[in-house]
Amino acid sequence: PQRNKKEAITRPYLMRRKDLYYLFYCFRGSDDFRDGTDSYKIGYAYSKNLTEWNRKDNIIFAGVKENWDANMMAYPSILSTGNKTYMFYNGNGFGKSGFGFAELIL
């Protein structure tokens, strides 16, 4: 669910792992979202029943100051292969400064 009326949530990716559903997405504010403090960030939520969700945006990860993804992390895409799961995402400037991936530990 939205935290406030000015928040935008986009690019959801739903996956199931054992008895939990995970929803990965990007979110942003309505003001100064291209390069500022309201820029895109990646978050996730989990649920047992697809109705009640626990949102955990602050746990996923954050860019290091002055890194290629320090100001923006957007448009997550999830890939599972073997027993590993990876998230690919765009960095600053909607991916202009690069894109990356991280292993998800669920």
Predicted feature locations:
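Carbohydrate-active catalytic/glycan-binding domains of CAZyme proteins
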Residues: P1-L106
